[in-house]
Amino acid sequence: MLRTDRTWWLALVGLCAVLVAPLFVVDVPPLLDYPNHLARAFVLASLPDDTILARFYAPHWSIIPNLALDLLAPPLMHVLPVHVVGRLTIAAAILLPVLGTVAYNTAIGGRWWSFGVGLVAYNTCLLQGFLNFSISVGVALLLASCWLRWREARPRRAIGLAIVGAPVLFACHLMGLVCFGLLIGGGELCRVVQTPSSIVRRGLALLSVFAAPAALYSISALQPLGGDAEFLPFGDKLFQLVTIFSNYDWALDVAVAAAAMGVPALGQVFRWGRVPCPAACAMGLLAIVFLAAPYAWKGTYLLDTRFAVMLGFMLFAGFVPNRVPPIASVGMALLFAARMVLLVVVWADHRIDLTDLRRVLAPVQPGQAVYVVEAGQQENPAYWTANPHWRALSDGTRLDEHLGALALIERRAYWPFQFDMPSQQPIQTREPYRKLSGKVGHVPDWAEAAVADVCGFDYVLSLEADAFPDPPARRFRLLARSGFAALYAIDACAG
């Protein structure tokens, strides 16, 4: 038994090592929103001492259920380089859901099957840079595993830890708190079905756990925020159960999705595995909420996608096989290896774009303002069809939209697309830069930029500069061009 335990722990360490290995390949991984979040953490770490950044931004702390990165990264940036801290937070976003999945599965009697979670570790939400969400889901799974282990044997310990952990989850990301509620709610529902007389006692325990987060939400900046909910067509919603596995090769992604969903399904049919009652109830609740949830609400997008990702982790957290056919085990191991090799290759190639971008940003001085423009996917579809695979996921989601944030991080220059929603980020843009940001709105394509009012900016930074010829020379003067990127001085700011 001791030898088996040692082998299991070594395998877990090996899995974690393989999963974080890509972070040693490139210093700015191609995660869509990540450069934007890193820039905000860099600003928070630099204020109030950096007088240049203080012209652009000011801290704006309030009760916000989306603060994991903002609380973790700035203190670390006082002792470690910014890109090291950034990759540490990505490592946390990768490993916490993996460790939480393993912990949950072992709490319900599983062991080796949970290691298959490596197939969903690099899911669509992680690759789109939703780090706070990913961290919070990992913490939710870890807390839920403790709840399952201790709820009956040591109820005070289980409830006490949950009461402390729930506000922490609220601070990390609200969706993590919702995930935790559904996981332990599923466990309690299972017990109530078995012992109906315990419904009041268990209901009061859940109320005590979520009382503090409910009070925090009622006074948070998110609570009064309005906005109509947006829903995807039902077919598109269901398709998200596959697209959560999206990486860089569609055929491989579909094979991974088929294996991750197919093995537990076949295990149930042929009775070589089971989904214990607490996990089954939790997965049922997650499925119901996924079907009912909007795609967008209160300024947050991909809401239902996040529940699909939670279900993806539960495929490995909630299934306990008596045995897994060797062909399935070998097949999943090969899929994992292929997925990780492809990811490492893609991330290594991404360094080409980073080198181009840094080369053209060299003339930018601290305190200057940089207008960023990109090649729209509809503006030049042929370019995107032939585009290098590191700039978009297999489902077409582009990943380079926020690379302009490097102008802020590495050149201490202003860029107009910093996330600063009061309900989601503890930072605000100062005037006159707030007015500049409002004037630009979204990241423009070249058709928009050619006639845009760019008064107030010093430069135009072009991403995908190899997609188009130079813009009008009477307005924009080329200073530097290097493959993916180009920098232009502004000679006539009004079109």
Which positions does each model-derived feature cover?
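Transmembrane catalytic cores of multi-pass membrane glycosyltransferases
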Residues: A21-H37, P48-D50, Y57-W61, P65-N66, ...
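Short hydrophobic/aromatic helix or loop-helix immediately within or flanking a transmembrane segment
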Residues: A39-S46, Y57-V82
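Transmembrane-helix motifs of polytopic, lipid-linked glycan transferases
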Residues: L88-I108
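Short acidic/glycine- and proline-prone juxtamembrane loop motifs at membrane-interface regions
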Residues: Q128-S136
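Membrane-interface transmembrane helices that cradle and orient dolichyl/undecaprenyl
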Residues: L143-A158
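Hydrophobic/aromatic-rich transmembrane helices and adjacent perimembrane loops
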Residues: K298-V324
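Signature aromatic-anchored transmembrane alpha helix within multi-pass, membrane-resident enzymes
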Residues: A317, P321-V345, H350
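Short periplasmic/luminal acceptor-recognition loop of GT-C membrane glycosyltransferases, typified by
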Residues: H350, V360-P444, A449-A465
